[in-house]
Amino acid sequence: MNNNIQIPKGYKPYKTIEGKFAAHIGPYYIKYKYPRTVFIVFIDNKLSNLNNVAHGGFLMAYADSVGGFYAYNKVKKPIVTVNLNCNFIKPVSVGSWLEAKAEIKTSGKS
C-alpha cells in the first residue's frame, strides 16, 4: 500500500478478514451514502499489469467483492457468485482511484 495517498473525505477503511482473499487485494475504502454504499480502491503498482493499468483479474475480483457485499446485505445470509461476466470499457491507470457501486436487481435460489 502507498502510505502517501490521501484518502478522499468521507471514506473509511473497509475491514476485511485477515488471511482471506480480499485482505490481499486492497485496501478498499467505503462510504455509507444513503441509499447507496460506495467503495473505492487506489490503483497502485501491486494491482497493475505490465501496461501500468489495473490488472483485469483484480478488476474482476474487486467487482465480485463489491457485489458480494451488496448481495449479503440484501439477503443477510452467506452467498456465492455463480456467474460473473465482464466487458472492460477502458483501462484504469496506476495512481487513480477506482469507485464501485452495485445494485441488486434480482436474486436466485442457487
Residue ranges of model-derived segments:
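Terminal targeting signals and extreme-terminal segments of soluble enzymes
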Residues: 1-110
